[in-house]
From Swiss-Prot:
The keyword Plastid does not apply. It comes from Streptococcus pyogenes. This is Inosine-5'-monophosphate dehydrogenase. Optimum pH is 7.8. Signal peptide: none annotated. Keywords: CBS domain, GMP biosynthesis, Metal-binding, NAD, Oxidoreductase, Potassium, Purine biosynthesis, Repeat. Gene3D superfamilies: Aldolase class I. It catalyses: IMP + NAD(+) + H2O = XMP + NADH + H(+). IMP binds at residues 308, 343-345, 366-367, 390-394, 421. K(+) binds at residues 305, 307, 310, 475-477.
Amino acid sequence: MSNWDTKFLKKGYTFDDVLLIPAESHVLPNEVDLKTKLADNLTLNIPIITAAMDTVTGSKMAIAIARAGGLGVIHKNMSITEQAEEVRKVKRSENGVIIDPFFLTPEHKVSEAEELMQRYRISGVPIVETLANRKLVGIITNRDMRFISDYNAPISEHMTSEHLVTAAVGTDLETAERILHEHRIEKLPLVDNSGRLSGLITIKDIEKVIEFPHAAKDEFGRLLVAAAVGVTSDTFERAEALFEAGADAIVIDTAHGHSAGVLRKIAEIRAHFPNRTLIAGNIATAEGARALYDAGVDVVKVGIGPGSICTTRVVAGVGVPQVTAIYDAAAVAREYGKTIIADGGIKYSGDIVKALAAGGNAVMLGSMFAGTDEAPGETEIYQGRKFKTYRGMGSIAAMKKGSSDRYFQGSVNEANKLVPEGIEGRVAYKGAASDIVFQMLGGIRSGMGYVGAGDIQELHENAQFVEMSGAGLIESHPHDVQITNEAPNYSVH
């Protein structure tokens, strides 16, 4: 069947082409609810996700964004073991109740306890009689190890075993806090009726609950985290390891999600993991979204070529302007009762509001977080200013590191035979990710207040766009003035 007669299908819009029309509002910005449910086990308190890029999201970024209420996607440019370890770091960074605490036996060496404590940045380890029966017999903490000279000595010689303070399984955080304070201790092991170790509550975790009240967490009180996989020979092995490490979702990450090979692989992944949350992309059309949902995906990622470091649209001549792509995919998502993530092209907080208004349930951001302390990119000084490296996953360097399969070039062994669809660059250093999130949320709340939307669903239903001319875009930015003091949420690109 020929598509000749519809070759020039329609006009496409991106963020700089449109503005949201202000409307009658009974909503103040501080009253806006930013919660978004992407899947049954994936409810975020803010609609922000950090990209699965090797200069954006490792465990530090994932922890920071989850504490703010969003979600980080651990990139896959590392071994399966390393990526699974990154997921574990996030899941163990914060717990309401630690349901699977580390433990050792009295026969283990002190050095093994120290290694465990340093690797996971914990201050103590429960000690059980045997690995099989898990009967609690003691605990060893930093204080017990402070003056030890022989780290080859068995833990039994240095652990605290008398007057152990414990609590029953099911103890709530309020009761645990009272017990910890009363006995001046930092860790409270939870035991069952047989004295078996069944959990652990720490004062640090209680403090984190208070410090980060909006953190995005799973049913066990652990931070939410996702991780990326490709469509390769190790996909199932990697996905298995990531889920075992605690990942709440995997992101099947390809440049063209509406591809027969990708769809077959996704269907196989769904069959292999029938009850797990699958996010997949990228696509830019309604048909692409439909194909992914039919293959078994829970959440579709939308965006081909809009990213600041992506060259797909000029190298391959392919893509759909992002606002149109979001709107088209969202129409299908509504039909299926599922959700989409708008991935790429966002420069300002106002673009986030536009992406959500067009039908997005959350946005995925790369460049806006690449300059933060938590991003894994290297810091460098250029002309007296501080920058961090930022590169597309389609850049030569990233493809050599492991992302070539994303662009269907996994079989290419020579760097000079790779055809990149991204570039390497630098972005200005921005400080803590939490500061960036604060400004973003302020902008989102303000935009939703202007259009009278109390939550994201109301934004979907009621927001209206106006097409903007080139002169309108110029008028939208500061003009006819020299900026002398940049605002924290606006800079000239």
